[in-house]
């Protein structure tokens, strides 16, 4: 279980209120698919994923990225119970989709990069540390069903 300090919670929620979920979500999933191309196999139904520009412009990638980042909003509402907040998604990704749990960690790191590029100086080392802790906690919660 991940424990967040009051300062970490404030850093996470303070930044989250400024995140454009649609834009950042699409960019995060798109980057995951470009940087780690083997993850594309989970998205066969998304159509053209043949190049970075095709991926970044793909409406299905953008829509699913928004959905993924929206789930982080649920995590932020449940910082004290990430495992419970992601129980159903963990089951889906393990039992039905058979996603390698390492991909959750990769996506989390990409999300941190996206936030850093979007927020620049506002994304201080303390904010980054809090978000890194969050994405790690989410990755662990999503991988829970695998254990």
UniProtKB/Swiss-Prot annotation:
- A GO CC annotation given for this chain: blood microparticle
- InterPro entries linked: Globin, Globin-like_sf, Globin/Proto, Hemoglobin_b, Hemoglobin_oxygen_transport
Q: In which tissues is it expressed?
A: Red blood cells.
Give an example GO biological process.
Answer: hydrogen peroxide catabolic process
The cysteines covalently paired via disulfide bonds are none
Region forming the signal peptide: none
What keywords appear on the UniProt entry?
Answer: Heme, Iron, Metal-binding, Oxygen transport, Transport
UniProt binding sites for heme b = 64, 93
What residue stretches are annotated with the Globin domain?
3-147
**GO MF annotation terms:** haptoglobin binding; heme binding; hemoglobin alpha binding; metal ion binding; organic acid binding; oxygen binding; oxygen carrier activity; peroxidase activity
The source's domain of life comes to: Eukaryota
Subunit organization: Heterotetramer of two epsilon chains and two alpha chains.
The UniProt family comment states: Belongs to the globin family.
Q: State the function annotated in the UniProt record.
A: Beta-type chain found in early embryos.
Write down what this protein is called.
Answer: Hemoglobin subunit epsilon-1
Q: Which organism is it from?
A: Capra hircus
């Amino acid at each position: 279980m991940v424990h967040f300090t009051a300062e970490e919670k404030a850093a996470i929620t303070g930044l989250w209120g400024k995140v454009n979920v649609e834009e950042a979500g699409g960019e995060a999933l798109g980057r995951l698919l470009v940087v780690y191309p083997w993850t594309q196999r989970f998205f066969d139904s998304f159509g053209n994923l043949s190049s970075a520009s095709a991926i970044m412009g793909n409406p299905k990638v953008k829509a699913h990225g928004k959905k993924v980042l929206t789930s982080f909003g649920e995590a932020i509402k449940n910082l004290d119970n990430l495992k419970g907040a992601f129980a159903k998604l963990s089951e889906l990704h393990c039992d039905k989709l058979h996603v390698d749990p390492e991909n959750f960690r990769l996506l989390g790191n990409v999300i941190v990069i996206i936030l850093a590029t979007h927020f620049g100086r506002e994304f201080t080392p303390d904010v980054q540390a809090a978000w890194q802790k969050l994405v790690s906690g989410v990755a662990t919660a999503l991988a829970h069903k695998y254990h």
